[in-house]
Amino acid sequence: MNKWDERFINLAEFIGEWSSCYQDGRHVGAVIVKDKRVLATGYNGAPSGVVSCKERGECLRKKLNIPSGTRQETCYAVHAEQNAICQAAKMGFCVDGATIYVTHQPCTICTKMIINAGIKKVVYKHGYPDEFSLVLLKDAGVELVKYE
């Protein structure tokens, strides 16, 4: 790892603090970078105009007893990686060939978006219990690096 990796993973952690997720430890940040330039950032939170779990004062998933890593569609939040990719698209930035720095290993759904967006490298700090996402990244030739 070099000083740029450290800067961008630290930025992802800072962005993750903006998360509107109700649960502690679920604050995730993402930064998409190309040629040492930040293209877009994202954090996990409710879509624009939708009241977040933090504002509601409860976690929908916890209320419905949904285990972590399952039924991800039953959540108000959009994942950090998804938000970053959407922001890049909204602003007209091409992420093909870019690197995404994420506080946590991407889930399978985010992994599919990362692959289809053309992102070629994923740098993450914390693991996530989703082995299939690792298989997909390997199959697609996306470099995966755990920041130590």
Language-model segments: which ranges?
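Zinc-dependent deaminase catalytic domain
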Residues: 1-148
